[in-house]
Structures are given as C-alpha cells and as structure tokens.
Amino acid sequence: QTVMLRHSHRFSGPIGELALAVNAGKPDLARACFAGDSGGQLAWSVPAQQEDVLRLALRGRADAPGGYQPYLALVHAGEAAYAQHDDWVRAVLHAFESFRILCAVREGEWGVAGLNTAIELRLEKDGLIRRSEWYVGRPVMVTRNDYGTGVFNGDIGLTLRDPARP
C-alpha cells in the first residue's frame, strides 16, 4: 500500500511563524513566537548536556509529557483498535507530529545527525524500537521535490507494516 502526502503542514501555525522569523534573520521576532504561543506548541529549551535532550525525547516536558512514547505506543499497538488501516495510519502520523526537537545545526553532537543517532540508540536501549535500516515506526524525510507525487524536500513520513504482509 502506498500512502501519499497531499498537504504540507510544515509551515503553518506557531512553527510556521517561527520558521519565517528564523529565515528572515529576526531573532527578536523568533523569541516572541515562543512567548506568544498560547497553545503550548512551542517550547524553548537549552539543555546542559545531550542526556537532557534524550530525556525530553523519551518523556517530553513536565508541562507536556509524552515525547516520542505516545507515537511509538500507537505504532506497536497496531491497527486492531481502528476500523480502517488508514485511520490507524492517520492516528500514528498525528501522534508523531505532536512532538519535534528542532536543531539549529545539521552536524555534530548537537546537530540533527548527532541527536537523531543518540535518540535512536536510546529508544532502542529502552526497548521502544528495534533499530535497523527500515524499522517499524522509523521517520523518513524527503530530500528532493517530486512534483509528480506532490512530495517535497523536508516532508516527513513513517515506515509502517504493510497490512497485506503481516
């Protein structure tokens, strides 16, 4: 089964306002996005060590618990509780979208690559994933536009089991 992304939500709401401020090079406006986010969708965190980020990824914040655990719980519970496979897929995607760690740089211990690796290793250590190249629940990011399918650079999807192949 193929699931197609039809609408990008990457730059809407508070995260969209933050992205515009950052891309425009307006740090004061970016900081104001955090102060003005009454829905609690954004949180500013300056961790002292990488372990703090790993705890955040596993459990979320005190005022917004969860981290990646709710999404992974849905992945592992499977679709049995849902009338349709597509309903389960939407629930998993929604749960995944409810938590993000954004990095200012790509490389290094504090960059996207370093934190993604550290988070995956911790999730595996805690039994939340079975890490391999294509483990169930693995996030994937599109790295170039494909106008034919409507999938664009930066869009995110998840690897899930094919219901036709249990």
Segments from the language model and where they lie:
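Conserved helicase motor core of P-loop NTPases
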Residues: 1-140, 146-148
